[in-house]
Regions:
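Aromatic-rich peripheral "rim/lid" segments of glycoside hydrolase catalytic domains that contact
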Residues: 152-212
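A structural motif corresponding to the C-terminal end of an alpha-helix
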Residues: 9-15, 46-57, 138-146, 195-210
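Extracellular glycoside hydrolase catalytic/binding regions
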Residues: 30-141
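Divalent metal-dependent phosphoesterase catalytic cores across multiple superfamilies
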Residues: 1-2, 43
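Short, conserved catalytic or adaptor-binding loops enriched in Gly and charged residues
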Residues: 9, 74, 179-181
Length: 212
């Protein structure tokens, strides 16, 4: 219950947009005695508690993919459904799917592309920039349904696929443009030392031209 301390401590801070519980917990029933309903019950309890402590901010969760009817029906106190979506260049399909199930607010809590192409075994910043532009624009085009997006991610992480003192190749198969592989240490729009990649300037241009 340490979260209640954080809510009470920071609920009046102007930087608080909303409170969010969990990141892709729905992918891990093993954390909840192999029964994902235990997570949804806990999420609902936490969301209801936060709303009683702070009625001025919505409560969200970072859900892996589109939430099921089980998740939606179990958590009426969740105001905003975040979705981590990796569907090649089509995050908008997930927006349509959730909108068909609920009128609750939604946002894309993760989306993006990495800068390493496993097919060519080389870094390809241009591909990442192109994919990032398409993904972000498709989300923005659906702003009547989707309130925003958190791009994954700002900075490369060197700890995820091997030696943390060097940038390693490694990850897993997924619907990631343009090689269907998520290279875990190449997701940043800047390098570890904060050198901007091509995708950084794409993101900058999109956000500068978008009305918020």
């Amino acid at each position: 219950n340490s979260y209640t301390w954080y809510v009470n401590q920071f609920k009046d801070h102007p930087a608080i947009l909303m409170w969010e519980f969990g990141n892709e917990f729905n992918y891990h029933p093993e954390w909840f005695n192999n029964n994902i309903q235990n997570w949804y019950d806990q999420l609902e309890n936490c969301a209801a508690t936060v709303k009683s402590l702070d009625p001025d901010h919505p409560v969200s969760t970072g859900h892996g993919e589109v939430p099921s009817s089980q998740a939606l029906n179990s958590c009426p106190s969740v105001d905003v459904w975040g979705m981590n979506i990796y569907r090649w260049l089509s995050p908008d399909s997930a927006i349509d799917e959730l909108a068909a199930q609920t009128d609750k607010a939604m946002y894309i809590s993760e989306a993006g592309a990495d800068s390493f192409n496993s097919n060519s075994n080389s870094e390809n910043e241009a591909e990442q920039a192109q994919a990032t532009e398409i993904i972000l624009n498709k989300i923005i085009e659906n702003s009547d349904l989707c309130i925003g997006v958190t791009l994954f991610e700002f900075c490369d992480e060197w700890w995820k696929a091997g030696n943390p003192n060097q940038q390693d190749i490694g990850g897993f198969s997924n619907a990631i443009p343009y090689d269907s592989f998520a290279n875990e240490e190449y997701w940043g729009i800047v390098t570890r030392d904060r050198t901007p990649k091509q995708s950084y300037y794409v993101v900058q241009e999109i956000y500068e031209s978008t009305s918020l």
